Amino acid sequence: MALSTEKKAEILKEYGLHETDTGSPEAQVALLTSRINNLTEHLKDHKHDHHSRRGLLLMVGRRRGLLKYLAANDVDRYRDLISRLGLRR
């Protein structure tokens, strides 16, 4: 299920650089992580939903690219973000 507008605003307020920030890597990674977690739960119940699985893999790849960019340009922000999101890196 897609993220509601309220949930997106809450995530952006917590992880964005300012309240209306939607473009920073932190905000984008946080939104992708939330969508990835929702889709992972969906796929636990619907194992043969290959169309959604492909979308999940695309989102994971996009998040990996954003994290790689952040790690290359600002390691402190990268480390802070992965610890706040609970990612395993």
From Swiss-Prot:
Q: Does the keyword Glycosyltransferase apply?
A: no
Per its UniProt record, what SUPFAM superfamilies does this chain match? S15/NS1 RNA-binding domain (SSF47060)
A GO CC annotation recorded here is: cytosolic small ribosomal subunit
* One GO MF term attached to the UniProt entry: structural constituent of ribosome
The answer on whether this UniProt entry bears the keyword Transcription regulation reads no
Q: What is an annotated GO biological process for this record, any one?
A: translation
Q: Could you list this entry's UniProt keywords, alphabetically sorted.
A: Ribonucleoprotein, Ribosomal protein, RNA-binding, rRNA-binding
**Pfam families in the record:** Ribosomal_S15 (PF00312)
* Signal sequence, start to end: none
What's the domain of life for this entry? Bacteria
Q: Please explain the role this protein plays, according to its UniProt record.
A: One of the primary rRNA binding proteins, it binds directly to 16S rRNA where it helps nucleate assembly of the platform of the 30S subunit by binding and bridging several RNA helices of the 16S rRNA. Forms an intersubunit bridge (bridge B4) with the 23S rRNA of the 50S subunit in the ribosome.
The annotated subunit structure for this chain is:
Part of the 30S ribosomal subunit. Forms a bridge to the 50S subunit in the 70S ribosome, contacting the 23S rRNA.
UniProt similarity note: Belongs to the universal ribosomal protein uS15 family.
NCBIfam families from the entry?
Answer: S15_bact
Return the protein name.
Small ribosomal subunit protein uS15
Per the UniProt record, the source organism is: Corynebacterium aurimucosum (strain ATCC 700975 / DSM 44827 / CIP 107346 / CN-1)
